[in-house]
Curated annotation (Swiss-Prot):
Entry keyword Zinc: yes
Keyword terms: Metal-binding, Nickel, Zinc
Binding site for Ni(2+): H2
Gene field: hypA
Protein source organism: Thermococcus gammatolerans (strain DSM 15229 / JCM 11827 / EJ3)
PROSITE patterns noted in UniProt: HYPA
Keyword check for rRNA processing: no
Gene Ontology terms, MF aspect: nickel cation binding; zinc ion binding
Family indicated by similarity: Belongs to the HypA/HybF family.
Job of this protein: Involved in the maturation of [NiFe] hydrogenases. Required for nickel insertion into the metal center of the hydrogenase.
Name of the protein this chain belongs to: Hydrogenase maturation factor HypA
PANTHER family: HYDROGENASE MATURATION FACTOR HYPA
Sites where the protein binds Zn(2+): C73, C76, C110, C113
Domain of life: Archaea
Length: 139
C-alpha cells in the first residue's frame, strides 16, 4: 500500500506540472528512488501506469533511478554506504525503515566510532527528477 501512496504523489506532481506548462501529453517521467526507502519499483510503476490511464500521461515512459544511501557521522565525520552494513538488518527492520526511514538511527551506528548521531547524506526519499512533456504544435 505504501508504494501506491508514493505513486499517487508522483502522478499528482507530474499531472500538476504538465497542466501548469500547458502540455498536450507527458512523454516521460524520471523518478529517483532512495535506496534507504527500499521501495518496490515494479509496484510503483504498475500503480503509476494505472493512475496515468485516461490522462495526458497515459503511455508515458517511466524511468527509475536508484540513489545509493550514504551516511555521515556527526561525531567523527566518517562516511559510509548502506550496502556496507545492510546485512545487519533482518526483514522486520527493513520493513520498519521502509515505512519510517528516520528509524534507521535506532538500528544503525557509525561503523568507525559507534555513534548513532549521523545524517543521511543521500538516498533517503523518492522524488521526481524530470518530466518530459509535449506542447501543442510540437512533435
Amino acid at each position: 500500500m505504501h508504494e501506491w501512496a508514493l505513486a499517487d504523489a508522483i502522478v499528482r506532481t507530474v499531472l500538476d506540472y504538465a497542466q501548469r506548462e500547458g502540455a498536450k501529453r507527458v512523454k516521460a517521467v524520471r523518478v529517483v528512488l532512495g535506496e534507504l526507502q527500499d521501495v518496490a519499483e515494479d509496484i510503483v510503476k504498475f500503480a503509476m501506469e494505472q493512475m496515468f490511464a485516461g490522462t495526458i500521461a497515459e503511455g508515458a515512459e517511466i524511468i527509475f533511478e536508484e540513489e545509493e544511501a550514504v551516511f555521515k557521522c556527526r561525531n567523527c565525520g566518517h562516511t559510509w554506504k548502506l550496502k556496507e552494513v545492510k546485512d545487519r538488518f533482518d526483514e522486520r527492520i527493513k520493513e520498519d525503515i521502509h515505512f519510517i526511514p528516520e528509524v534507521v538511527h535506532a538500528f544503525l551506528a557509525c561503523p568507525k566510532c559507534g555513534s548513532h548521531d549521523f545524517e543521511v547524506v543521500q538516498g533517503r526519499g523518492v522524488y521526481v527528477a524530470g518530466i518530459m512533456i509535449e506542447k501543442e504544435g510540437e512533435a
